[in-house]
């Protein structure tokens, strides 16, 4: 109802989750309103055998991974801050593990979205692959609340790796660092996380 009213009266709306964005995505408009989603913080379902789950928009990545840990699966997108999953979907977040696990577009299989006119739609499905119809899910990922407010997210999960090894490498030039990263990937060396620091 709120979005419908705001739409009818041309009042700008900014959805707010955890506020961890570094890009100013949650900066409001003096003639608009902010809709706080912090109470939408429930993990709705987990299907370990199918490697997926459904969460509300303000579940954080740490909250979800703490919940999943005992089942041997995890949510692999790691933008750095303990962001809300809805915000991560809205900004098409990625992180240092994108080299192995992809981005939010890779791990989201469906959304529940409240449109500006107040209608509630569901996009996508739990299926791993489908070619039926338009890909409305990807339309909303990265739209930063401009097309509607994401309230629920269907996510693909990954198995927790048996072991993890970390290394820091120094390079004389930026070009050397980039070439080495490309070669590591081309040779098929399993790498889950890569980050360049200057």
Language model feature labels by segment:
Residues 22, 196-198:
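Short proline/glycine- and acidic-rich turn/helix-capping motifs at secondary-structure junctions
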Residues 42-49, 53-195:
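FAD-binding subdomain of flavoenzyme oxidoreductases
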Residues 1-40, 75:
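Glycine-rich N-terminal segment of FAD-binding domains in flavoprotein oxidoreductases
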């Amino acid at each position: 109802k709120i979005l419908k009213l705001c739409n009818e009266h041309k009042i700008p709306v900014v959805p707010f989750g955890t506020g961890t964005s570094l890009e100013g995505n949650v900066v409001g408009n003096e003639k608009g309103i902010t809709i706080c989603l912090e109470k939408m913080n429930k993990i709705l379902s987990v299907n370990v055998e199918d490697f997926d789950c459904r969460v509300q928009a303000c579940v954080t990545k740490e909250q979800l991974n703490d919940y999943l840990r005992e089942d041997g699966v995890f949510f692999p997108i790691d933008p750095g801050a303990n962001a809300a999953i809805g915000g991560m979907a809205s900004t098409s977040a990625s992180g240092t593990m994108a080299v192995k696990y992809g981005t939010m577009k890779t791990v989201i299989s469906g959304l529940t979205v409240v449109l500006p006119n107040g209608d509630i739609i569901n996009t996508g499905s739990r299926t791993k692959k489908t070619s039926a119809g338009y890909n409305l899910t990807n339309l909303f990922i990265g739209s930063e609340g401009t097309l509607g407010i994401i309230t629920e997210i269907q996510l693909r999960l990954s198995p927790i790796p048996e072991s993890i090894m970390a290394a820091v490498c120094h390079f004389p030039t930026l070009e050397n660092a980039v070439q080495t990263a490309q070669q590591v990937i081309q040779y098929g060396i399993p790498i889950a996380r890569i980050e360049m620091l200057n």
